[in-house]
Amino acid sequence: MLTSDLRLLFLDFFAKRGHKVSPSASLISNDPSVMFTIAGMLPFIQCFLALEPPPHPRVVSVQKCIRTSDIDEVGKTPRHGTFFQMMGNFSFGDYFKKEAIEYAWEFLLSELDLAPDRLWVTIHGDDKESEKFWLLCGVPQERVQSLDSNFWSTGKAGPAGPCSEVFYDLHGGPGPGPEGDPDRYLEVWNLVFMQNLRDNDGHIISSLPKKCVDTGMGLERIAMITQGVGTIYDTDELKPILDEAGYISGKRYGKDRRDDISLRVLADHIRSSLMLVADGLRPSNEGRGYILRRLLRRSVRAAKLLGIQENCFDQLFAKAAQVMKVGYPELEGKLAEIKQVACLEEQSFSRALNAGTQLLSRSMSSSKKRVSGDLAFRLHDTHGFPIDLITEIAKDSGLDVDMDGFFTLMKEQKDRSRAALSRSKPIVSDTTGYEGLRSNFLGYEMLQVDTKITALVKDGTILTSAKQGDCVDIALEQTPFYATAGGQEADRGFIESDNFSGKVVTVFSPLPGLTVHRCEIVSGLVVSGEVVRASVDSANRFAACQSHTATHVIHAVVREMFGSTSVQMGSYNRAGYLRFDFSCSYAPTDSQRIELEERANRAIQSCLEISSTYTTLEKAVASGAIALFGERYGDTVRMVEIGGPWSRELCAGTHLRNSSEIAVVSLVSETSVASGIRRVECLTGFDAFSHFAQERALVDTVMRTLGATRQEMEGAIDDLRENLKRSKHALQTAKDKFLSAFAPRLLQEFKSVSSVRILIADLSKFLSGPLFSPFEFTAEDIRAVTLRCKKLLEEPHVLLLAAVISGRVHAACSIDLSSVKLSCMDDLSANNLIKVFLKTLDGSGGGRADFAQGAGWNAKLLDSALDNLKACVIGKLSGV
């Protein structure tokens, strides 16, 4: 039976028995305590907790789920996968154990035609009711096992109850049951009976007034049974993806265990990524987006392990969508966008994987037993390697990873980020003094409000008053001040009365519905409870509105130019300045940057009306409003429109009334901030005009310097560039001649030991002084001098030259002992010598027996490393 048929069969079975069919919720859970929807009951958790009414007393669903806790086991076992579909029927105070058990048994036997002698049941030891109902269904007593672990709870105070599980015997015949051999018996259905209420200590304190049923049956597992295959990867929704990967790679599934693991990883991770991107997730370096990035990057490595050198995501995602669209038809319309997101990640990480793998390989070849924490951090931070991927690659080579060192460096990086953040944003973790307080925000309509102080707080301490020179947090009944939120910087201004004056330096929201003003008391004495006047700096507010409205304009233009796949990844705006991050698979060209700025200013000059309305989230999204991914919205949302449908976004920030009030936008920077994420920075209003004036002044200075008119400038710069190119070439030619002439002089520095000429030295010590100052020496110069000396020497020699260049030690080694017979010949090869030398400098190198080169990181040890190597070589040549 096809998986799609199983899905429909299950829904139809329970629909005929009075259940309302509930569509699958998004994989992106609304529960902040979990990253993804990990169980069929999760969308109904508020109903089970009696915090929301259920959609119907009886519900049935097939829920998309993602679990990555066992991601390392994916591909290695027949049952582990990250994406799965959970079929479930639910009762909210309607039926209970008897009906749930009867429904389950009837579906398994009558609808799926499973052999009853292959089915086993487990119950909680104290749940005699469930045992009785299973026996009444015809399950033999010996196939009902009691397990104390069959008890479900939320893990905290709340509903709880016993559960009953149905297992399928994969082998058949006599056996010990699930308790005795868990690998032989596959759990297919779990029936949870919520009947108790537990306290925080886990003690049952009462029975629930309404008993509920929550069941879950894995669609992939039951498909595995009904299709008669040995693993979930052989079922009809995963096997086609796996076969496509096999076709691309030329690998045959079932022939090689390591290849089989990679094929399974590809099949699972591609399908999981397909469904996550379809639900709106995008790769990033934190939270849910990082999990998606891990899945995609593990897929890239799996493809490389299979020998796939070309990009393959386009083909694999198309196959996955073709298979999954039967159950999820919305995939067809989203496929182009999904492939664009996935292929971008594939392209960027393929390059990083090659560079990072080479770095990791050099570490592995240096006879070290482990990957250092520093190297792991560099791979993670610079090349984007997820740490689990680093440990996986290291494990394949028999190495471990210095995780303590890695996490120490990660913590230092996070501490630096937090320190930077704390300098720009007030972080209030202690909400003492604010409990129960609310403030009414009037700042959309008013910039000045007469109101009352409801609290004075300093460092978590409630004050009755504050004097001149104090910095204190003030809560008001009503406020016109906008708090830092949604990327918009807080308002500035003053809070004053006849008794004091306080300068508002920032505004924040420590609790939902509460605005707090951090004030420097400029004069007088402020007393809690007094009536004050709160006044926003109107010029600063207007300039902030210019930037925020311009951010929406830039967003709309970005989507016009780069497509709907270019979604907002972050923003920041303050008076005169905006920063906007968006997803894009490539670096925009110079002409596209110019076009972006021109389009934005054209929209500004079009005098587009700006309005805001309150509506439901459902209606806003249906009208085309952009809801930013990762933001949490209530049932009622504020929708800001610019030019009607041209720009519609859910936004609580402050805005202008007409686009023309922005005046002008100047795009001053466009850069990459992460893989697949671009950033534009713009100036707005007066700051933009000021920037234009500075640019004109700079152009005038360049014109005077070049002695050219504005029309002649480009040609003059080209001439200057060509002259510079010729000068560099002449300087390089002079340097080459100088080094060629310098090499014979260097021969005078050689010493003789056992008829072998030796020079092991820091080359920079011979290249100092005014004669050498015009030249900038490179690693290639060290190589060139070494090879020149090698050519000039007509006798046995050991030559190693090193120098510190840009903080790293670069070295080259030449050895010729062909005409002498020494017992140390095997040890004294250039390849061995360069490796021994650079290992002491935390570096690596290699080459041939007669010539080798490389680099090291620890420049401080250069002198001692040269002395030690020289002593070692002399000792070997002397027979010591």
From Swiss-Prot:
GO terms for biological process: alanyl-tRNA aminoacylation. Gene3D superfamilies: 2.40.30.130, 3.10.310.40, 3.30.54.20, Bira Bifunctional Protein, Domain 2, Threonyl-trna Synthetase, Chain A, domain 2. InterPro entries: aa-tRNA-synth_II/BPL/LPL, Ala-tRNA-lgiase_IIc, Ala-tRNA-ligase_IIc_anticod-bd, Ala-tRNA-synth_IIc_core, Ala-tRNA-synth_IIc_N, Ala-tRNA_ligase, Ala_tRNA_ligase_euk/bac, DHHA1_dom. It is an enzyme of class 6 (ligase). Disulfide bonds: none annotated. It catalyses: tRNA(Ala) + L-alanine + ATP = L-alanyl-tRNA(Ala) + AMP + diphosphate. Binds 1 zinc ion per subunit. Its cofactor is Zn(2+). Its EC number is 6.1.1.7. GO terms for cellular component: cytosol. Keywords: Aminoacyl-tRNA synthetase, ATP-binding, Cytoplasm, Ligase, Metal-binding, Nucleotide-binding, Protein biosynthesis, RNA-binding, tRNA-binding, Zinc. It comes from the Bacteria. It is found in: Cytoplasm. Zn(2+) binds at H548, H552, C651, H655. GO terms for molecular function: alanine-tRNA ligase activity; aminoacyl-tRNA deacylase activity; ATP binding; tRNA binding; zinc ion binding. The keyword Ubl conjugation does not apply. HAMAP family: Ala_tRNA_synth_B. Catalyzes the attachment of alanine to tRNA(Ala) in a two-step reaction: alanine is first activated by ATP to form Ala-AMP and then transferred to the acceptor end of tRNA(Ala). Also edits incorrectly charged Ser-tRNA(Ala) and Gly-tRNA(Ala) via its editing domain. Belongs to the class-II aminoacyl-tRNA synthetase family. Consists of three domains; the N-terminal catalytic domain, the editing domain and the C-terminal C-Ala domain. The editing domain removes incorrectly charged amino acids, while the C-Ala domain, along with tRNA(Ala), serves as a bridge to cooperatively bring together the editing and aminoacylation centers thus stimulating deacylation of misacylated tRNAs. NCBIfam families: alaS. This is Alanine--tRNA ligase. It comes from Tropheryma whipplei (strain Twist) (Whipple's bacillus).
